[in-house]
C-alpha cells in the first residue's frame, strides 16, 4: 500500500513543503526565522481575533474598550499584551530574516526576495494601522503625522490625505477604516507568505556557503522540524517573559492618555521597530524629500539583486563586505536610537550622517567592495 501522504492531493502538498522537502544539510540557526515568522503571524491572528471581539472602533469608546479588555475580559490583559509584544517579536524575527538574506546572498532568488520586500511593506502598514487603534495620544498623533506626509505629494497630496482620513482631520471615519484594514491585512500577509514559500520551493533553500547543494540534501522532517521547534520554544519563552514580567517595556507611556486633538505630545514617535525609518524621514529638511527617503529606505532592498557585483554569493568568505554588513547593522541601531530622540543638536547631525551612511553602504560601498573582492581573487 502506497503512503497516503505522498498521494493524497492535499497531504501531498503539505508533505512536499514540510516533510520530504529536500533541504541543504548545512543551514544554520539563521534559517529558523522563516518558521518563527509563521508562528508569530499565527499568534498575532489568534490574539487579534479575540481582541476584535471586544474592541469598538469608535472615537468615543475605542480607548475605554481597550481598558475594558484589560480589566473585565477573562485574561484580556494577557491577550492584549501578547498581541502588542508579539508585534515587536514579529519585527525582531523579520529584521533577522532580512539580515540573513543580505548576509548569505539569498536576495539572488529575486522572485522570493521581491515577494519578501512586499511582505515587509504590508507588515509595516498593518503594524502602523494597529498602533492607531487603542486611540491614545501617541496613536492619534502618530496617525495624524504619518498620514499627513502624503500631503507632500504634488497636486494630489491634500485630496489624498482627506480621502484617507474620510474628513478634514483624523476622526471616527479614519479609526473605523483603519480597524477594517488592520483586520483584513494579516490574511493578505498569509496569502503573500504562501506565494513566498511557493517561489522558495521552486529554487530550494540557499545555504551559508552560497553554493548549489543538490548533492548534499536531507529531508526537512525530522531534522529541521526539531530545529525549528527548539527556536519556537525560545520565541514563546521570550514572548511570555515580555508579556508577564515587562508588558509595557516596549510601549509608550503617552498611549495611556486618551487621544486629545487639542494637546500635542512633546515628542511624537512611532513604535521602536519603525524608529530607523522615522530617523531617515526626519533627517531631510524637505517634506517631500523626507517621504521619498522614507519609502526608499525599504524599497532599496528590492535593488539588492541588481547591485550584486561579487562572483561569490555569500559574505562568508568576503571580509571586506562582512565589515560593511556589520557597519550597516551598527548604523541601523544608531538610526533606531536617533529616531527616539528629540529634534535638537547633536541628534540632528548624527541622524543625517547615519541616514547618508545607510544609503551609501547599499548603493556605493557594497558594489565597490564586491568588485575589489573579485580582483583580490585573481591575485
Curated annotation (Swiss-Prot):
Subcellular location: Mitochondrion inner membrane
Membrane topology: Multi-pass membrane protein
Gene Ontology cellular component annotations, sorted alphabetically: mitochondrial inner membrane; respiratory chain complex III
Protein name: Cytochrome b
Family that this chain belongs to: Belongs to the cytochrome b family.
Positions annotated to bind heme b b562: 83, 182
Provenance organism: Procavia capensis (Rock hyrax)
Cofactor binding description: Binds 2 heme b groups non-covalently.
Amino acid at each position: 500500500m502506497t503512503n497516503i501522504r505522498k498521494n493524497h492531493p492535499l497531504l501531498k502538498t503539505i508533505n512536499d513543503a514540510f516533510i520530504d522537502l529536500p533541504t541543504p544539510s548545512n543551514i544554520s540557526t539563521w534559517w529558523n526565522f522563516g518558521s518563527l515568522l509563521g508562528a508569530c503571524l499565527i499568534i498575532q491572528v489568534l490574539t487579534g481575533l479575540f481582541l476584535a471581539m471586544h474592541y469598538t472602533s469608535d472615537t468615543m469608546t475605542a480607548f475605554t474598550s481597550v481598558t475594558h479588555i484589560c480589566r473585565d475580559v477573562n485574561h484580556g490583559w494577557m491577550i492584549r499584551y501578547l498581541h502588542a509584544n508579539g508585534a515587536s517579536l514579529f519585527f525582531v524575527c523579520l529584521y533577522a530574516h532580512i539580515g540573513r538574506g543580505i548576509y548569505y546572498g539569498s536576495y539572488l532568488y529575486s522572485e522570493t526576495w521581491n515577494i519578501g520586500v512586499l511582505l515587509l511593506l504590508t507588515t509595516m502598514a498593518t503594524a502602523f494601522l494597529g498602533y492607531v487603534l487603542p486611540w491614545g495620544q501617541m496613536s492619534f498623533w502618530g496617525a495624524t503625522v504619518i498620514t499627513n506626509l502624503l500631503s507632500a505629494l504634488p497636486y494630489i497630496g491634500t485630496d489624498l490625505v482627506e480621502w484617507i482620513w474620510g474628513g478634514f482631520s483624523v476622526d471616527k471615519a479614519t479609526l473605523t477604516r483603519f480597524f477594517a484594514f488592520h483586520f483584513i491585512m494579516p490574511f493578505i500577509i498569509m496569502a503573500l507568505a504562501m506565494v513566498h514559500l511557493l517561489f522558495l520551493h521552486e529554487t530550494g533553500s540557499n545555504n551559508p556557503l552560497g553554493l548549489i547543494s543538490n548533492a548534499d540534501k536531507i529531508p526537512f522532517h525530522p531534522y529541521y522540524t526539531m530545529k525549528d521547534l527548539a527556536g519556537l520554544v525560545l520565541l514563546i519563552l521570550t514572548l511570555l517573559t515580555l508579556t508577564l514580567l515587562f508588558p509595557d517595556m516596549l510601549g509608550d507611556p503617552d498611549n495611556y492618555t486618551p487621544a486629545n486633538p487639542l494637546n500635542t505630545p512633546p515628542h511624537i514617535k512611532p513604535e521602536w521597530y519603525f524608529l530607523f525609518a522615522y530617523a531617515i524621514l526626519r533627517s531631510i529638511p524637505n517634506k517631500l524629500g523626507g517621504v521619498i527617503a522614507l519609502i526608499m529606505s525599504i524599497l532599496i532592498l528590492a535593488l539588492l539583486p541588481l547591485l550584486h557585483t561579487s562572483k561569490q554569493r555569500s559574505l562568508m568568505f568576503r571580509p571586506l563586505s562582512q565589515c560593511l554588513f556589520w557597519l550597516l547593522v551598527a548604523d541601523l541601531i544608531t538610526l533606531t536610537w536617533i529616531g527616539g530622540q528629540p529634534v535638537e543638536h547633536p541628534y540632528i547631525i548624527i541622524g543625517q550622517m547615519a541616514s547618508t551612511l545607510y544609503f551609501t553602504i547599499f548603493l556605493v560601498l557594497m558594489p565597490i567592495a564586491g568588485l575589489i573582492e573579485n580582483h583580490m581573487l585573481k591575485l
